[in-house]
């Protein structure tokens, strides 16, 4: 039995249910049904185990976490355990009554997704009518209650030109921080890659827009920026290194090293109903396999950045090369690197196909706001 340093944070994917249908969603293609979701007692136990391990942060996500009626109870439990609580939400479900309950429970931060600053573009991406006005009202409610607000803006070929507007929106909505992140091609994002891939020219324009805003705004707004891997020369340290800083809990209670880990066929993922979190973290097959550097191929073993990027993303290596145990093809040392760049350029230059919206296999009845 081994003991690894505890993760910094735990992501609780409470549900895969969501009013939105964003084509870049990082949720798996096989979405968990309501009947499969872990119950309140299971999530409370998870929080207790995380706190006992030394985890510092609990991020409540989904799907849409505000669809869980027990969310205030879970936030309150996290508070009692000394865990920092963060809500990651679409802002179109739950409304002010739920927000009041969450504030009373001790919620400490809200991250709100924004699909576009153009109302029609926002609705098209979200697959949901009137999404932007509802998000604006939710942001106002968050700030009226004194809660810190971060805007999460996901970029792709259809909205890359509107980065300045997204930053202006964050200021207007009194956010303290904005994360401007290009689509990461996992889950539904990978399925929709050809519909979402920006051109290199679009990428460079977003870099310039962020650099300009940082110079002009100084400390008045924190701006985080994430580039698309397909145009990079070096891989990013996925999740800060596999099994090192982050643990993801699926709605079913499966314990994952990252959002997309379930795409790796043949890997065994333990469930909280059957095994304790600390044991899974320290000794679970899924966490041990790619933790550290021993698993790395020879080309990575000799790289001075091996303990900086940790070989890149395992799920991306699988998706692009068919082998999760090889170096991330985004890396310029990979024999597949040129092919990755060529794929991005080819897809960005071609007409964008229609979105494949994030929908369960048996979608719930459409609401008046759902775009079909």
UniProtKB/Swiss-Prot annotation:
Disulfide bonds: none annotated. GO terms for molecular function: 4 iron, 4 sulfur cluster binding; cyclase activity; iron ion binding; oxidoreductase activity; S-adenosyl-L-methionine binding. CDD domains: Radical_SAM, SPASM_PqqE. Gene3D superfamilies: Aldolase class I (3.20.20.70). It comes from Xanthomonas oryzae pv. oryzae (strain KACC10331 / KXO85). Residues 4-219 form the Radical SAM core domain. Binds 1 [4Fe-4S] cluster. The cluster is coordinated with 3 cysteines and an exchangeable S-adenosyl-L-methionine. PROSITE patterns: RADICAL_SAM. [4Fe-4S] cluster binds at residues 18, 22, 25. Its cofactor is [4Fe-4S] cluster. It comes from the Bacteria. Its EC number is 1.21.98.4. This is PqqA peptide cyclase. Keywords: 4Fe-4S, Iron, Iron-sulfur, Metal-binding, Oxidoreductase, PQQ biosynthesis, S-adenosyl-L-methionine. Pfam families: Radical_SAM, SPASM. Belongs to the radical SAM superfamily. PqqE family. GO terms for biological process: pyrroloquinoline quinone biosynthetic process.
């Amino acid at each position: 039995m081994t003991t690894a340093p505890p993760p910094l944070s735990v992501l609780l994917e409470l549900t895969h249910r969501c009013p939105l249908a964003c084509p870049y969603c990082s949720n798996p293609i096989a979405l968990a049904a309501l009947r499969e979701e872990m119950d309140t007692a299971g999530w409370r136990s998870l929080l207790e185990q995380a706190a006992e391990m030394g985890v510092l942060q609990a991020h409540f996500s989904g799907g849409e976490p505000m669809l869980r009626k027990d969310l205030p109870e879970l936030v309150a439990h996290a508070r009692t355990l000394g865990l920092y609580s963060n809500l990651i939400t679409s802002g179109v479900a739950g409304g002010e009554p739920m927000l009041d309950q969450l504030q009373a429970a001790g919620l400490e931060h809200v991250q709100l997704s924004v699909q576009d600053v153009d109302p029609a573009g926002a609705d098209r991406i979200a697959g949901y009518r009137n999404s932007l006005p509802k998000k604006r009202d939710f942001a106002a409610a968050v700030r009226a209650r004194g809660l810190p607000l971060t805007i999460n803006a996901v970029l792709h070929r259809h909205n890359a030109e509107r980065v300045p507007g997204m930053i202006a929106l964050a200021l207007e909505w009194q956010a303290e921080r904005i994360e401007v992140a290009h689509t990461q091609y996992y889950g539904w994002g990978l399925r929709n890659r050809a519909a979402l891939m920006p051109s290199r020219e679009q990428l460079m324009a977003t870099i310039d827009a962020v650099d300009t805003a940082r110079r002009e705004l100084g400390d008045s707004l924190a701006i985080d920026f994430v580039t698309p891997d397909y145009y990079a020369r070096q891989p990013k340290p996925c999740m800060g290194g596999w099994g090192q800083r982050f643990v993801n809990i699926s709605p079913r209670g499966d314990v994952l090293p990252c959002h997309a880990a379930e795409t790796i066929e043949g890997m065994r993922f333990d469930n909280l109903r059957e095994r304790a979190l600390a044991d899974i973290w320290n000794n679970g097959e899924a966490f041990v396999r790619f933790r550290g550097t021993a698993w790395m191929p020879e080309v990575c073993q000799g790289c001075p950045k091996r303990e900086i990027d940790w070989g890149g993303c395992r799920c991306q290596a699988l998706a692009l090369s068919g082998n999760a145990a090889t170096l991330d093809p985004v890396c310029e040392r990979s024999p597949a690197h040129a092919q990755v760049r060529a794929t991005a350029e080819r897809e960005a230059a071609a007409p964008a196909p229609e979105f494949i919206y994030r929908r369960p296999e048996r979608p719930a009845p459409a609401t008046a706001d759902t775009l079909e």
